[in-house]
C-alpha cells in the first residue's frame, strides 16, 4: 500500500526528474491502482499487462546495442522473470524482449534515467550488467572505466593508499581481460585460473 501513498511516489518522481536514477527488478512499485499495476510505470517506462488491462500496442523494436550491454557476449539470463511486461511512454528503449513482451528496458524521465529488469538472478555476467546499469541510471557512464576490466569473469580492486591495483580472475579457466585506468586502456592481461595479479597505478 506504500505505492499508493502520493507522498512516496511524488518524492521518487521528483528525485528521478531532477537527475536521479531508478532501477527495478521483477515487480517494483507493484500495486493495482487507478489502471496501473506499477505505480511508477511512467518513471520506468514499463507496466505489467493484467487480465483486465486495456489493449496496448506491444510490438516494439528491440535495440541490444546500448551502454548497459557492452562487453556482454551471451544472451542475458532473466531467470524465471516477470511475465507480460510491456514498454510504454515516449522515452523508453527496449534492450531485450521475449516475443512481444519486454525483459530489459531503459527510460528517460525528466533529467533522470531508469532501468527495468524482468528478472536478474546471480551470475558474473548479471553482476556486470547491474554495475553498468547503476552507472547508466546515475547518469555517470563515463566514470565507469575509471578502474575497469572488460571480462565479466574478472574484477578489479583498487588500493589508492599504496597506488596498487589487484586484477582478479574469479573463474576456473584462463581469462583474458583489458584493464582501463581513468578511461584509458592500460594493459591486456592473461590470467590463470583464480589468479590475482598486482598492477601499479601509475596514472
Feature locations, PLM:
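A conserved amphipathic helix/loop scaffold
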Residues: 3-203
